[in-house]
Amino acid sequence: MKVGLIGHRSAGKTTVFNMLTGLQAQVGGYGGKEEVHLGVIKVPDARVDKLSQVFKPKKTTYAEIRFTDFPASQNDDDLKGNSNLVTQMREVDAMALVLRDFEPDADPLRQLNDLLTEMILADLAVVENRRARLKKEKARPQEEALLERCATTLENEESLRNLEFSADDENLLSGFGFLSRKPVLVLFNQPDDKAGQPLSAAYQDELKRRGL
């Protein structure tokens, strides 16, 4: 499984990456460069351990999670024109959004909105480009109708994960790797004195509203 970590600068994204992977990637060290941190962890599994004890294979292989720590985001335009970064993001299976919530003036819900908007805009650009090509071909009415539905949703600033698709639709969409369709885990990076406390009602309501 591949998981991508995204977040604004100083959200603690790379710190989370280091904690998950045991690596020591430089924190706050991007300096405007489009570098990406990669890390892999083995997933402990008691069932695999038991089978290994019984069958005694030469090698015991555990499932892996591959984490990608993407460069920090600054605003809604960060993904525009950055086709290389967007391509890398489309290759992950799920997104972890790291939100800064350890300062009095932090606004994690605004950060959440910014990050989701970036993904929506990136998907909309892909949809618009594909629709333009289909209009010239005039040979795939089913795909045209499907992408029109996607475009309407994205133009309303809604994620594609909120839509339901048929099996045929899924086949047509499988090659796009839409960012706003990927499962999302939201991480609120809070101070130690909030550890173990439930999220505020405002946070929970916003996540529920967005289907997260």
Kindly label every feature range from the protein language model.
Residues 1-104, 108-109, 116, 127:
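Conserved G1/Walker A P-loop phosphate-binding module
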Residues 2-7, 11-17, 21, 133-212:
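C-terminal-of-GTPase-core extension/linker across diverse P-loop GTPases
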Residues 31-32, 66, 130, 141-142, ...:
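Residue-level detector of alpha-helical recognition elements and their boundaries
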Residues 52, 128, 204-208:
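Class I S-adenosyl-L-methionine
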Residues 70, 96-104, 110, 118, ...:
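G-domain G4 guanine-recognition motif of GTPases
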Residues 108-119, 204-206:
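A short, gly/pro- and small-residue-rich
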